C-alpha cells in the first residue's frame, strides 16, 4: 500500500512540474533594430584612416520596426579589435529629455545593453542613434594596413575597413618646461575632473611666483587645491592645502612664493555642470622676474551617449454632448424677471451657473441680449448653434448665466393679504380682503336686496 502511495506522489510531482508556469525572460532583440554603423574621429566626422593610438567614435543608427515593451532590450557587442575608453552607462533620450532606454556596459563581456523604458509603451515610430568611444586593441590589429572589423547590425554583421597606421616615437626627452598642465576624468564618477599643474620643471629662479588658473565653461571648483614643493630631484619637501574660489572672470590665484631650484605640483578637482564634448582650463605662472607663461589643458569627454525620437499618442477625442435646442430643453419652472419670464432648465445648475430659456422680444438684438445677461455674443451663438446675428420675436434662446445674476433680476411674487378671525385662541383666515380696485361680486347682490327691502317697506306704508 505504501508503495502505491509513493508511486502516486511521484506522478503528482511530475505532473505539477510540467504544469507549473515558468517565468519568461524579457525579449532581447539583439542588433536587429540597428541599421548602420560607422567609424568617426573625435569631431564626429566619418573617417577611414586612423593611427594605432587614435581614439575612435563608433556611431550607430537604429529604427524600431515593430512594437516593443518596457523591460525589453537591444544589445551590441564590442568587436575584438576595439577597447572601450569609458564603461559608464548612459540614457537614450528624446529632445524633451524623456528617457527612451537606459544603456549599461558590461566590462567583462564587452556588451552594451539598452533596456526600454515605459516611453516605448506609449510612443510609436521610434528611431535614433548612439555612439561609444574606443581605442584600438593592439593585440588584435595590424598596423600600416586595412583592418576589417565586423560590427553587429540587423542581427548579422556589417564590416568596416579602416586603415590603421603605426605611430613612430620621436627621439629626445624634450626641454624642461615652466608650465605644464593636464587633466583627466575620474574613473568612477564621470562628472569629476582631476587637474594637475606642474610649475618650473626647468628649475628657473622665480621671485614672488603667482599661479593663476582660468576655469573654462561647463565646470565649477570642487574642494581645495593641494600645493607640493619639490627639490631638484623632484622629491616632495613641503605640502600646502589652500582654499580656492573663482572671481567674476572665473579665475583663482595661488601665492607660490620664491622658487630657488624648486618645482611645484598643484592638484585640484572640478565638477561638471554642463555636458560638453571637452573641458578646458588655462594655467598661468608669473613672478617679479618672470613674464607670464600660460598653457591650456583639455579633457575630452569620451563617454557614450545617444538620442532618439518617437511619436506620442494622439490626444483623446473629446466627445461633445448632443445639441438640444432651447424648445426641447426640460423645464423645471418659470420665474418672472426684470427682462420678462425665464424658463429654468431642469438640473442645469453647475459651478455657480444655471441654464435659462429667454424668449426674444421685438427690438432685441444679440448684443443687447448678451449685455442683459452678462454673456458674450459668441457664447449665445455657440449655445444655440446660430449662424447669423439675426433674431426674431418669439425665438427662444438658451443661456448659461450666473446664478447670482438670476437672483438679482428675479421679481418677487405679490403677497395677498387675508382677513382673519380668532376661534378658540387660534387665528384663522376667513377670506381675502379686497385690494384697491378689486371688484366684489357680493356688493351688487347686497345692494339689490337693500333696494328691494326699501321698496317693500315704503309700499306697505302707502
UniProtKB/Swiss-Prot annotation:
Propeptide segments, given as residue ranges: 437-462
Signal peptide: 1-25
One annotated GO biological process: cell adhesion
Pfam families, alphabetized: Big_8, Collagen_bind, LysM
Cellular compartments annotated: Secreted, Cell wall
One Gene Ontology MF term: collagen binding
Pentaglycyl murein peptidoglycan amidated threonine PTM positions: 436
A GO cellular component annotation in the UniProt record: extracellular region
Membrane topology, from the record: Peptidoglycan-anchor
Induction: More prevalent in stationary than exponential phase (at protein level).
Motif LPXTG sorting signal: positions: 433-437
InterPro entries: Adhesion_dom_sf, Collagen-bd_dom, Fibrogen-bd_dom1, LysM_dom, LysM_dom_sf, SDR_Ig
Domain LysM residues, every copy: 356-399
UniProtKB keywords: Cell wall, Peptidoglycan-anchor, Secreted, Signal
PANTHER family listed in its UniProt record: LYSM DOMAIN-CONTAINING GPI-ANCHORED PROTEIN 2, MEMBRANE-BOUND LYTIC MUREIN TRANSGLYCOSYLASE D
Name the UniProt record assigns to this protein: Cell wall protein Lmo0880
Amino acid at each position: 500500500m505504501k508503495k502505491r502511495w509513493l508511486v502516486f506522489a511521484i506522478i503528482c510531482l511530475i505532473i505539477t512540474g510540467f504544469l507549473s508556469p515558468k517565468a519568461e525572460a524579457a525579449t532581447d532583440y539583439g542588433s536587429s533594430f540597428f541599421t548602420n554603423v560607422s567609424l568617426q574621429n573625435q569631431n564626429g566626422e566619418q573617417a577611414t584612416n586612423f593611427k594605432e593610438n587614435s581614439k575612435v567614435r563608433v556611431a550607430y543608427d537604429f529604427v524600431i520596426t515593430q512594437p516593443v515593451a518596457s523591460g525589453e532590450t537591444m544589445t551590441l557587442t564590442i568587436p575584438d579589435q576595439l577597447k572601450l575608453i569609458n564603461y559608464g552607462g548612459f540614457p537614450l533620450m528624446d529632445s524633451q529629455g524623456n528617457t527612451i532606454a537606459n544603456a549599461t556596459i558590461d566590462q567583462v563581456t564587452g556588451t552594451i545593453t539598452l533596456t526600454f523604458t515605459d516611453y516605448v509603451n506609449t510612443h510609436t515610430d521610434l528611431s535614433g542613434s548612439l555612439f561609444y568611444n574606443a581605442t584600438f586593441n593592439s593585440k588584435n590589429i595590424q598596423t600600416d594596413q586595412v583592418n576589417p572589423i565586423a560590427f553587429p547590425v540587423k542581427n548579422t554583421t556589417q564590416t568596416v575597413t579602416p586603415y590603421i597606421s603605426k605611430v613612430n616615437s620621436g627621439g629626445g626627452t624634450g626641454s624642461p618646461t615652466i608650465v605644464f598642465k593636464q587633466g583627466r576624468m575620474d574613473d568612477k564618477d564621470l562628472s569629476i575632473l582631476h587637474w594637475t599643474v606642474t610649475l618650473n620643471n626647468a628649475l628657473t629662479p622665480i621671485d614672488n611666483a603667482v599661479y593663476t588658473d582660468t576655469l573654462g565653461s561647463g565646470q565649477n571648483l570642487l574642494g581645495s587645491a593641494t600645493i607640493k614643493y619639490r627639490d631638484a630631484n623632484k622629491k616632495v619637501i613641503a605640502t600646502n592645502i589652500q582654499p580656492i574660489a573663482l572671481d567674476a572672470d572665473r579665475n583663482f590665484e595661488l601665492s607660490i612664493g620664491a622658487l630657488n631650484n624648486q618645482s611645484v605640483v598643484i592638484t585640484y578637482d572640478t565638477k561638471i555642470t554642463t555636458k560638453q564634448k571637452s573641458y578646458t582650463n588655462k594655467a598661468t605662472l608669473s613672478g617679479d622676474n618672470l613674464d607670464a607663461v600660460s598653457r591650456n589643458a583639455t579633457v575630452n569627454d569620451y563617454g557614450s551617449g545617444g538620442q532618439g525620437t518617437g511619436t506620442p499618442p494622439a490626444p483623446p477625442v473629446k466627445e461633445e454632448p448632443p445639441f438640444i435646442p432651447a424648445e426641447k430643453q426640460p423645464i423645471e419652472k418659470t420665474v418672472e424677471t426684470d427682462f420678462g419670464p425665464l424658463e429654468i432648465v431642469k438640473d442645469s445648475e453647475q459651478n455657480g451657473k444655471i441654464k435659462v430659456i429667454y424668449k426674444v422680444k421685438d427690438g432685441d438684438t444679440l448684443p443687447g441680449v448678451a449685455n442683459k445677461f452678462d454673456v458674450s455674443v459668441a457664447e449665445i451663438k455657440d449655445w444655440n448653434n446660430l449662424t447669423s446675428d439675426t433674431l426674431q420675436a418669439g425665438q427662444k434662446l438658451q443661456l448659461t448665466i450666473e446664478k447670482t445674476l438670476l437672483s438679482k433680476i428675479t421679481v418677487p411674487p405679490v403677497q395677498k393679504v387675508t382677513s382673519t378671525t380668532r376661534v378658540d385662541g387660534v387665528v384663522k383666515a376667513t377670506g381675502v380682503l379686497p385690494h384697491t380696485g378689486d371688484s366684489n361680486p357680493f356688493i351688487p347682490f347686497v345692494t339689490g336686496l337693500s333696494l328691494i327691502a326699501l321698496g317693500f317697506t315704503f309700499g306697505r306704508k302707502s
